[in-house]
């Protein structure tokens, strides 16, 4: 993948393999990997789930898939084209899109910037849609700058993060 417009950073296969068990998948779950890249998360998914994928650099845009999925598991690029065609932060775009389509959960790899992306108004949207951050797994990836986290959001279970809706 020579084009790095979207700030593509390949997920180490071992990391994907070690993170998948944190996701409470059950037999028959429909799972999409919307930013497949070279397939680290997709290939690490257990055989008992139904898998689908998208990859913008292979002309299979995640927004062109219309099915609903139980789980979304991915390492999104740092930026994607927004509705105006300008490159923008992809983490909120991922959550905004899939919190209306995923039935059980969303798990994604992101850096510390993802916390800044969760503004009070965006946290309110997640709460209105019934989503909670249920787990954050800290990851050390030496070849990447900064600290990385595997965020797991679910409709079921209890969240560990809350917000103050007022800006001070």
PLM segments and residue spans:
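Class I S-adenosyl-L-methionine-dependent methyltransferase catalytic core
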Residues: 1-168
């Amino acid at each position: 993948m020579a084009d790095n417009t979207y700030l593509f950073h390949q997920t180490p296969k071992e990391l994907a393999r070690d993170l998948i068990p944190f996701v409470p998948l059950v037999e028959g779950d429909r799972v999409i990997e919307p930013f497949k890249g070279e397939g680290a998360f997709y290939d690490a998914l257990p055989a008992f789930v139904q898998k689908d994928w998208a990859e913008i650099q292979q002309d299979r845009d995640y927004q062109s898939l219309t099915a609903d999925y139980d789980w979304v598991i991915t390492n999104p690029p740092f930026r994607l084209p927004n509705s105006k065609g300008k490159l923008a932060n992809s983490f909120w775009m991922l959550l905004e899109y899939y919190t209306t389509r995923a039935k059980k959960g969303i798990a994604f790899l992101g850096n510390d910037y993802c916390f800044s992306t969760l503004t009070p108004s965006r946290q309110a949207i997640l709460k209105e849609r019934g989503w909670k951050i249920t787990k954050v797994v800290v990851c050390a990836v030496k070849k990447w700058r900064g600290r990385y986290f595997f965020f797991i959001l679910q409709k079921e279970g209890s969240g560990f993060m809350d917000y103050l809706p007022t800006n001070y």
